């Protein structure tokens, strides 16, 4: 009945990577999983303005290595690396093991579904007209080379009494093609008249020969010591 599988989970292990890459026995698995959850929760609360697109956690030899993909690395690193060092110490206390933090810069945030969704959420919370925010996001993403994008908002749009859903799409967004590199994220805008949901799908192209998706817009940083359519439901 029109229900869609999560595009990222659908492609996991085929063209998408896991966000946590470690192995554990039965006794340690729950502990590691809980530790990962607390670390991600801590980073989300501490780095709300850093435009974080992804956090990858690895656990080599009784330590934890965290790679933060961000569009604003300067906010995380801080002056002479002071902020990232404080962050490292806090994560070591939460995880209970020595930690290492790597920063990877997202060169084109307009091609990242999470950052696009958060941008739309921020504009809606600042009372920007939702249609304008959606159209601007679609235009910027297509201009930077995406093959297609779909943006959907739902809730009490513009404060009306009855909730509804509106969406814009430009280009192709083939959700059932496993080799299609689809980036997806859902976010929420908290307004005075309720919560508005924002969903973003971005089609970056097809990945052939069973190769895993590699984000071309990311560069590691070592801290110092077609046609537009409109729809309504």
Curated annotation (Swiss-Prot):
Source organism per UniProt: Baumannia cicadellinicola subsp. Homalodisca coagulata
Extract one GO cellular component term from the record.
cytosolic small ribosomal subunit
The molecule here is called Small ribosomal subunit protein uS3
What's any GO biological process attached to this entry?
A: translation
Q: Which gene encodes it?
A: rpsC
Instruction: Give start and end of each KH type-2 domain.
Output: 39-107
Identify the PROSITE patterns for this entry: KH_TYPE_2 (PS50823), RIBOSOMAL_S3 (PS00548)
Q: How does it assemble?
A: Part of the 30S ribosomal subunit. Forms a tight complex with proteins S10 and S14.
- Describe its function: Binds the lower part of the 30S subunit head. Binds mRNA in the 70S ribosome, positioning it for translation.
- Which Pfam family, just one, is annotated for this protein? Ribosomal_S3_C
InterPro entries in the cross-refs? KH_dom, KH_dom-like_a/b, KH_dom_type_2, KH_sf_prok-type, Ribosomal_S3_C_sf, Ribosomal_uS3_bac-typ, Ribosomal_uS3_C, Ribosomal_uS3_CS
Q: Which terms does the record give in the GO molecular function aspect?
A: mRNA binding; rRNA binding; structural constituent of ribosome
Indicate the family of this protein. Answer: Belongs to the universal ribosomal protein uS3 family.
Q: Which domain of life is it from?
A: Bacteria
Which keywords describe this protein according to UniProt?
Ribonucleoprotein, Ribosomal protein, RNA-binding, rRNA-binding
Q: Gene3D superfamilies recorded for this chain?
A: 3.30.300.20, Ribosomal protein S3, C-terminal domain
Give the matching PANTHER family.
Answer: 30S/40S RIBOSOMAL PROTEIN S3 (PTHR11760), SMALL RIBOSOMAL SUBUNIT PROTEIN US3C (PTHR11760:SF19)
């Amino acid at each position: 009945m029109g229900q869609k599988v999560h595009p990222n989970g659908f492609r996991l292990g085929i063209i998408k990577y896991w966000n946590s890459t470690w192995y554990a026995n039965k006794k340690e698995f729950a502990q590691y999983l809980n530790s990962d959850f607390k670390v991600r929760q801590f980073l989300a609360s501490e780095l709300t303005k850093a435009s974080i697109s992804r956090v990858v956690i690895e656990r080599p030899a009784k330590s934890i290595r965290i790679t933060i993909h961000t569009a604003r690395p300067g906010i995380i690193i801080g002056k002479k690396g002071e902020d990232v060092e404080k962050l490292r110490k806090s994560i070591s206390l939460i995880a209970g093991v020595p930690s290492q933090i790597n920063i990877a810069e997202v060169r084109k945030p307009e091609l990242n579904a999470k950052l696009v969704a958060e941008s739309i959420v921020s504009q809606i919370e600042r009372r920007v007209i939702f249609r304008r925010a959606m159209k601007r996001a679609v235009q910027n993403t297509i201009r930077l080379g995406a093959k297609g994008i779909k943006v959907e908002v739902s809730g009490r749009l513009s404060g009306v009494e009855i909730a509804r859903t509106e969406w814009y799409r430009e280009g192709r967004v083939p959700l059932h093609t496993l080799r299609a590199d689809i980036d997806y994220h859902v976010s929420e805008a908290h307004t005075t008249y309720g919560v508005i949901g924002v969903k973003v799908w971005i089609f970056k192209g097809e990945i052939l020969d069973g190769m895993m998706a590699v984000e071309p817009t990311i560069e590691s940083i070592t801290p110092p010591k077609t046609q537009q359519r409109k729809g309504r439901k």
